[in-house]
C-alpha cells in the first residue's frame, strides 16, 4: 500500500482520449505514470518508486521507447504487481508465460477493436479484388485509367476466415452483404449459432476453397508463419490475401514469391512482419494495398479501447481479478 492507504496503478505509455476515466481511477488507487524514458530507467524505478504498484496499464506505444514487456521486464517488476492490463487485442508484446510463472494476470481488449478492424479488412478485400491500388498508382503518375486491367467482383466468391473470433465474426457479418460464401477454420469449431453463417472446414480445405483468405488470428507460438510457402502451394491460383491480424502470422518473403508466381492475385495488408519495415517486394508491387497498421486508428475505437483497458485496471484494483484474461491464462491455449 502507498502512504494514502491505496494500492498504486501505473500507466506505462500515454492515453489519447480517456483522461477523465484515468483520473477517476484515483478514487481506488494512487495513480502513477511512466510516459517516456528508457528500459534501464524503468527497471531502476521498479526497485524504488514503483514498489507499491498493484496493476499496470500498458499501452502499445510504450514499446517504442522501452521495448516490449519481455521476461527481463516481468522478472524485475515489484512483487506487488498482480495485474498487467494491455491496451490492445493483440498482446504478443507481453511475455505471458513469464507473467504466469510469477502469478501475474494479463488482460487484453478483444471486443472494442472488432468493428474498426473488420471495416479495414473489408476495405482491403474490396480494394485487392477490384485492383483499386493500380488505379491509384496510375493517377499519381498522372495517367488516367492506364494499365488498369479488369478485376474481380466479390459476389459469389468464397471468403475463407482463419480465426473466427470477434474480428473474424464481424468480418463475416459484413461480407454477407456482398453475397459471398463464407468458410472458416478454428482450432475448435464454434457452435453453429455463433458462426455468423460461416461453414467450418479443415485447414487444408480452407486453403483450397478460398477465393479470398482473411487472416484474423492472434500471433503466438502456434500461429507464427502459419501461412508460408507450403500453404501457398495448396491455395487456389489467383487467391487474394487479407491480413489485419499480425504480420508474423504469415511469411512475408513467401507471400512476395507467391505474388511473383501468380499464385496470389493481390493482397491487402494492414500489418507487417517487422513493423515499421516492409518487404521491398510488397512496396514495389502495385497490385498490393498497404496500410500502416490503421486497423483501430479511429477516434471512437481508440476511446472504446482505452475505456475498456481502464475498466480492466479497476477490476484488478477493486475486485482482485481481471476480466478479459488472455487465452493462455484462461486455458484456451496450451
From Swiss-Prot:
Annotated SUPFAM superfamilies: Formate/glycerate dehydrogenase catalytic domain-like, NAD(P)-binding Rossmann-fold domains
Binding site for NAD(+): 166-167, 244-246, 270, 293-296
MF (Gene Ontology): glyoxylate reductase (NADPH) activity; hydroxypyruvate reductase [NAD(P)H] activity; NAD binding
Classification via PROSITE patterns: D_2_HYDROXYACID_DH_1, D_2_HYDROXYACID_DH_2, D_2_HYDROXYACID_DH_3
EC number: 1.-.-.-
Any GO BP annotation: glyoxylate catabolic process
Residues that span the membrane, as ranges: none
One Pfam family recorded for the sequence: 2-Hacid_dh
Gene Ontology annotations for the cellular component aspect, listed alphabetically: cytosol; nucleus
Keywords, alphabetical: NAD, Oxidoreductase
Domain of life, source organism: Eukaryota
Active site: 246, 275, 293
UniProt cross-references to InterPro entries, sorted A to Z: D-isomer_2-hydroxyacid_DH, D-isomer_2_OHA_DH_cat_dom, D-isomer_DH_CS, D-isomer_DH_CS1, D-isomer_DH_NAD-bd, NAD(P)-bd_dom_sf
CDD domains reported for this sequence: Mand_dh_like
Family, similarity comment: Belongs to the D-isomer specific 2-hydroxyacid dehydrogenase family.
Protein name (Swiss-Prot/TrEMBL): Putative 2-hydroxyacid dehydrogenase UNK4.10
Amino acid at each position: 500500500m502507498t502512504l494514502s492507504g491505496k494500492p498504486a496503478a501505473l500507466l506505462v505509455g500515454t492515453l489519447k482520449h480517456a483522461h477523465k476515466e484515468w483520473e477517476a481511477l484515483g478514487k481506488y488507487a494512487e495513480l502513477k505514470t511512466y510516459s517516456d524514458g528508457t528500459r534501464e530507467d524503468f527497471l531502476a524505478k521498479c526497485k524504488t518508486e514503483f514498489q507499491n504498484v498493484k496493476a499496470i496499464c500498458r499501452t502499445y506505444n510504450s514499446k517504442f521507447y522501452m521495448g516490449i514487456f519481455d521476461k527481463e521486464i516481468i522478472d524485475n517488476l515489484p512483487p506487488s504487481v498482480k495485474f498487467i492490463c494491455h491496451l490492445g487485442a493483440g498482446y504478443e508484446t507481453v511475455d505471458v508465460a513469464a507473467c504466469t510463472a510469477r502469478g501475474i494476470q494479463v488482460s487484453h481488449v478483444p471486443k472494442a477493436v472488432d468493428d474498426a478492424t473488420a471495416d479495414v479488412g473489408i476495405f482491403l478485400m474490396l480494394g485487392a479484388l477490384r485492383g483499386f491500388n493500380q488505379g491509384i498508382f496510375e493517377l499519381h503518375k498522372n495517367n488516367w485509367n492506364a494499365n488498369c486491367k479488369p478485376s474481380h467482383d466479390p459476389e459469389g466468391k468464397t471468403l475463407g476466415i482463419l480465426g473466427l473470433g470477434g474480428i473474424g465474426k464481424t468480418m463475416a457479418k459484413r461480407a454477407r452483404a456482398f453475397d459471398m460464401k463464407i468458410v472458416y477454420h478454428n482450432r475448435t469449431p464454434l457452435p453453429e449459432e455463433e458462426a455468423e453463417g460461416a461453414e467450418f472446414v479443415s485447414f487444408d480445405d480452407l486453403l483450397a476453397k478460398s477465393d479470398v483468405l482473411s487472416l484474423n488470428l492472434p500471433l503466438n507460438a502456434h500461429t507464427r508463419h502459419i501461412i508460408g510457402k507450403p500453404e501457398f502451394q495448396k491455395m487456389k491460383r489467383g487467391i487474394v490475401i487479407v491480413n489485419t491480424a499480425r504480420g508474423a502470422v504469415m511469411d512475408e518473403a513467401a507471400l512476395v514469391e507467391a505474388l511473383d508466381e501468380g499464385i496470389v492475385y493481390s493482397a491487402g495488408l494492414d500489418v507487417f512482419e517487422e513493423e515499421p519495415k516492409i518487404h521491398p517486394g510488397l512496396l514495389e508491387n502495385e497490385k498490393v494495398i498497404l496500410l500502416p497498421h490503421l486497423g483501430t486508428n479511429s477516434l471512437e475505437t481508440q476511446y472504446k479501447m482505452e475505456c475498456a483497458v481502464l475498466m480492466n485496471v479497476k477490476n484488478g484494483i477493486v475486485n482482485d481479478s481481471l476480466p478479459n484474461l488472455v487465452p493462455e491464462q484462461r486455458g484456451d491455449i496450451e
